[in-house]
């Protein structure tokens, strides 16, 4: 399982055999600060990231990244979910931004598929509530993943954008909660 949080920022974790894989450097799954794979010419060097680099996946795929893309195209700011809603209503600019966002996500997840070959990719965070991602992104990632047979599934976290908070609550020591 490759679990992705896409909201204010982006992050991920890797589950192998039902256990979190941390890696020797404790950064396994640190996907948001990798560069956007297969960038188009106008995506280079990419927006500055708070980590000090440019063009990190997070700068493109976070909610603010989608909002920034829309603002650059339309000249006004909208939250990520508002861009998706406007696209669903037939707005051409919002639709173009969503299509580009989905292509960027497909590239980024195809890189993960080519390296980890997960059975499932789970999306959580606020952006995970954009339902069209679950049909459109898997249709696109085949162009970039190094396989002609892809069975990886893209699903929304069971508890949606509250999954991270629920997970943290499960990990909280009972003695502290009392």
What are these regions (language model features)?
Residues 33:
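Histidine-centered active-site/metal-ligand motif
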Residues 27-30:
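Structural signature of FAD isoalloxazine-binding scaffolds in flavoprotein oxidoreductases
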Residues 10-11, 57:
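Histidine-centered metal-chelating micro-motifs
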Residues 1-5, 11-13, 48-50:
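Short glycine-aspartate micro-motif
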Residues 20, 38-178:
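ATP-binding/phosphotransfer module of carbohydrate and carboxylate kinases, centering on a glycine-rich
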Residues 13-17, 21-23, 36-37:
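Short beta-strand-to-turn element immediately C-terminal to the catalytic PLP-Schiff-base lysine
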